[in-house]
Amino acid sequence: SSTATDWMALAMGRYGYFDSVDGKYTYLIDDGTGYTDYLNAMKSYVEKTYTENGGTLHSVKATEWHRGVVTIAALGGDPASFGTYNGQPINLIADGSYNCKVKGGPGKQGINGWIWGLIALDTGMYEVPSDAAYQRELFIKEILKMQLTDGVDGNKYGGWVLGGYGSSSDVDITAMAIQALAPYYNDDTVYTYKNEISGDEVSKTVRQCVDEAFDRLGSMMNDKAGFTSWNTDNSESIAQVIVALTSVGIDPQKDSRFITSDG
């Protein structure tokens, strides 16, 4: 299990298309044996790492658990019971998100820990125990309160950046934050929090924040309908934006913010 191999396995597990006519999802790679082999290898890695590290995957990076969760789920495994440690099932959801084993919690890694912690929780809409250290609402608020003050089109707030603090939104992190918040886009809950950039007390719905972020992303698109992250034009940033848009039901081919002047 590694950053490169897990993402590749995730992509293979999700590679397919949805047929709106018959309502079925067709997998273009349906290698059950390959999935099982990878899950078994990954389980061995998790058990070995837990044993060597005293019950953790990493001392700082909660995303080590989160990446595992989404990969295991994509391949048909159960991240809430994946291998054993000291005779007990390993719950990657609990250990990486709501009872995060990283000292300092998911936020030890910055906004990435909160973003992927929420994505991991919602991979299977896992229930968070009432006595858990980190409730679902906290993940949402921690993301919202780091929204940057670089809004466009009359908005004060824009997107997000990897370090959590800065003056200019990053395409990839903004898109990933939107993906994490997507399940709450149509929820009317108003969240009140202190924005860590402006210092202002803010009361907004997730939808309001996400719409501001989409406006900011649209302003970052270049004349070739591409995006730049870390000073580099790349297809990954385009893919992140497409996933963000579709995660809330927006068609990238019809939203004027993401269509160039020449179409």
What is each residue range found by the language model?
Residues 25-38, 60-64, 80-95, 253-263:
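...the same signal can extend to comparable exposed beta-sheet modules
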Residues 42, 46, 96-97, 139, ...:
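Buried hydrophobic core positions in alpha-solenoid tandem helical repeats
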